Amino acid sequence: MENIKLAVIGLGYVGLPLARLFATRYPVVGYDVKRERVAALMEGRDATQEVSDELLRSVLLPRLPEEGEAGLFCTSDAEQLRGCNYYIVAVPTPVDLHHSPDLTPLYSASETVGKVLGRGDIVIYESTVCPGITEDECVPLSLIHI
């Protein structure tokens, strides 16, 4: 597997540890809509402690990774995802009082990926969804701009 550049969409309790681990071997761009969270992560601080500050700092890059350069760069600018060829969507799918999932974050992430997706790129949905949601709703949103 050569020329891998990963994007992890959603830097929460699933996305951040995943991004950190992949960044030990591959170039990774971590994306989150929460600018304050991204700023803290880029300073090497994870308030949730999903990843220790020491482990986080060990993989952080001050800029987008170059081809073949292992490390993690975090951003809230979706344009900086352009050039990645593997996208892992790890956004929350919270449920309401009636136990119905709120798929808004998933739809938004699918649209974000779709704007930078290239032919042959791979999208992996890590978020928990009901059967059929990925194929019927997320994929069409991702492909709308190709």
Please identify what each model-predicted range represents.
Residues L64-Y125, C130-I133:
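Rossmann-like NAD(P)-binding element
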Residues M1-D46:
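NAD(P)+-binding Rossmann beta1-loop-alpha1 motif at the extreme N-terminus of oxidoreductases
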Residues D46-E50, A90, L141-S142:
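Short, hinge-like loop/turn segments at secondary-structure boundaries
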Residues M42-E43, E50, G83:
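Phosphate-coordinating loops and pocket residues in cytosolic domains that bind phosphorylated ligands
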Residues I144-I146:
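Conserved small/polar residues in nucleotide/adenosyl-binding loops
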Residues D46-G71:
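N-terminal glycine-rich dinucleotide-binding loop that anchors FAD/FMN and/or NAD(P) in oxidoreductases
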Residues L41, L56, T134-S142:
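Hydrophobic packing residues within well-ordered alpha-helices of enzyme cores
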